[in-house]
């Protein structure tokens, strides 16, 4: 049986002589209601293939498997191997104890579609999700719990304070939304920040996707500069290119939608 409360997780770790790693940013999910909500928004049904990143103490891992999913779970902390092996015994769960940042998911994941379910610290979450959106087409749905401010960047609208490159990448490759917010007290130990679950459903890559993201990266690298300056290194004549698609050279990257960057990519 998987741990569902802070006390159960603390007891399980203590029994194995373990404690959460501050270095790894470990905050283990310890709330059955939040676990059920994640399983629901992920659309888990029998036969669904789930890539779980950050299995931790297995609270979500076991819930996914109990709902009928085939779970391939990655956990960077090999100390947790006996814990996860204990709580997932008899379930359709395949465990890997490696750093996911060193795994070529496009090669490792066979067939599809896959649903990524993850509880990620900031330093891992953003680059991992951006890479998977761009390069791992077999992942059809992303259900990712991260620090709230980070999660909101993937679903932000042009002109908002959270809007940036993650928003554009998500806007090009998926339809993103914040499913719900998660308070600190549902974790063990409790983090100092709120979290949120962002859901992204993949859409077919449109023409110009790679170029559009390159343009967005250049624009947000100098986000306070007007496009005519921030894109000077990627267009021979940026003013003409920008105007050719009905945009203003005095605009900034934060003013452009994903669709705007796609139009500009084809200029």
Features from the language model and the residues they span:
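Catalytic cores of RNA-modifying enzymes
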Residues: 1-218, 243, 263-266
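An accessory alpha-helical subdomain
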Residues: 196-202, 207-240, 245-248, 253, ...
């Amino acid at each position: 049986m998987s741990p569902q409360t802070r006390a159960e997780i603390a007891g399980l770790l203590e029994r194995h002589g373990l404690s959460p790693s501050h270095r790894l940013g470990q905050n283990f999910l310890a709330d059955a209601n939040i676990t059920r909500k994640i399983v629901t928004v992920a659309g888990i049904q029998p036969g669904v293939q789930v890539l779980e990143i950050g299995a931790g103490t297995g609270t979500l891992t076991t819930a996914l498997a109990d709902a009928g999913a085939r779970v391939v779970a990655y956990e960077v902390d090999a100390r947790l191997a006996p814990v996860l092996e204990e709580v997932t015994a008899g379930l359709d769960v395949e465990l890997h104890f490696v750093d996911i940042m060193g795994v070529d998911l496009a090669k490792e994941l066979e067939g599809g579609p896959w649903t990524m379910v993850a509880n990620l610290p900031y330093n891992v979450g953003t680059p991992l999700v951006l890479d998977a959106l761009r390069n791992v087409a077999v992942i059809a749905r992303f259900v990712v719990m991260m620090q709230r401010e980070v999660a909101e960047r993937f679903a932000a609208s042009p002109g908002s304070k959270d809007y940036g490159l993650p928003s554009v990448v998500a806007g090009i490759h998926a339809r993103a939304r914040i499913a719900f917010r998660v308070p600190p007290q549902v974790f063990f130990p409790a983090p100092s920040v709120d979290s949120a679950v962002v859901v992204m459903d993949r859409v077919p890559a449109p023409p110009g996707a790679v170029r559009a993201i390159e343009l967005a990266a250049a624009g947000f690298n100098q986000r306070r500069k007007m496009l005519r300056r921030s894109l000077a290194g990627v267009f021979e004549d940026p003013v003409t290119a920008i105007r050719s698609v009905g945009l203003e050279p005095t605009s900034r990257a934060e003013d452009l939608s994903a669709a705007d960057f796609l139009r500009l990519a084809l200029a």
